A protein has these predicted regions:
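Catalytic Walker B motif of ABC-type/P-loop ATPase nucleotide-binding domains
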Residues: 159-163
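The feature captures the beta-strand-to-loop junction immediately N-terminal to the Walker
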Residues: 33-35
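Conserved ABC ATPase signature
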Residues: 134-138, 142
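Conserved ABC ATPase "signature" region
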Residues: 97, 112-130, 155
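Conserved ABC transporter NBD signature motif
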Residues: 56-64, 73
Length: 260
């Protein structure tokens, strides 16, 4: 259980997230949605212990994460940032191994169990086929899978992703979201991710948090959050909301008029 209580945080003494309180249950698949600048990434950074709050607390199973040792937190919660710079020609399997650091001994030597875990993760993420390749040679979708593999190598129960499908085609997006859903449904991982694609958020996430101007505008199931009134208010655009005939999940469709 994650409890966020009266959290305010930001940069240069300016609050980007303002007095947020919400609970996240174990095993949930949470999608954080909202316009650019709403505070989604800032909230994830605070949740991951990377950004100290101006006020408020974040508790993980009753313990304030900012009072936990970093190595202990890294064994409980992992975070994959958006657009992580990949400027050095790492071999893919070596790059994934970096995720094992919290579990390694004092000298940071990889042991047999670390190599076995990496093999298991590469199988799961379908990255073994390019394990020996230079990471700079990979496509956008392949790189994202490698980043996910490195994040999974931390072997945490809670995983936070910042826009894991940004700049990817629909096929790569679907592949990654299916991967996250398997992690959630079959492996019991708690997934928290920011998403710009409202329809992907509604399709794959168990619950959504709609942010606006640093606050939580609404939260709940996809059907509860993705209603046309709230979406039009937050995004300042006209939409209609239909139902996917296969999944029965809401589909948000922007409406454009030649008269405007």
């Amino acid at each position: 259980m994650i409890q966020i209580k009266n959290l305010s945080c930001g940069y240069n003494k300016i609050a980007v997230v303002d007095n947020i309180s919400i609970d996240i249950s174990e095993g949930a698949f949470i999608g954080i949605i909202g316009k650019n600048g709403a505070g989604k990434t800032t909230l994830l950074k605070a949740l991951s212990g990377l950004l100290k709050p101006y006020s408020g607390n974040i508790f993980l199973n009753g313990t304030d994460i900012y009072k936990m040792k970093k190595n202990l937190l890294a064994k409980k919660l992992s975070f994959m940032p958006q657009n992580m710079p990949l400027d050095f020609p790492f071999i893919v399997k070596d790059f994934i191994m970096f995720g094992r650091f919290p579990h390694m001994n004092f000298f940071k030597y990889a042991l047999k169990q670390d190599y076995e875990k990496i093999e298991e993760i590469m199988d799961f993420t379908e990255t073994k086929e390019f394990a020996e390749r230079n990471i700079l040679e990979l496509s956008g979708g392949e790189r994202q899978k490698v980043l996910i593999a490195q994040t999974l190598a931390q072997e945490t129960d809670i995983i936070a992703f910042d826009e894991p499908t940004s700049h990817l085609d629909i096929g790569s997006q679907s592949s990654i979201f299916r991967l996250l859903r398997i992690l959630n449904k079959k492996h019991g991982k708690t997934i928290i991710t920011t998403i710009h694609d409202l329809n992907a958020a509604g399709e794959f996430c168990s619950n959504l948090i709609l942010m606006d101007k640093g606050t939580i505008f609404s939260s709940g199931t996809a059907t509860e959050v993705l209603n046309y009134k709230d979406i039009e208010t937050v995004y300042n655009t006209t939409v209609v909301v239909k139902t996917n005939p296969v999944s029965n999940k809401p589909v948000v469709i922007p409406v454009f008029s030649d008269n405007k």
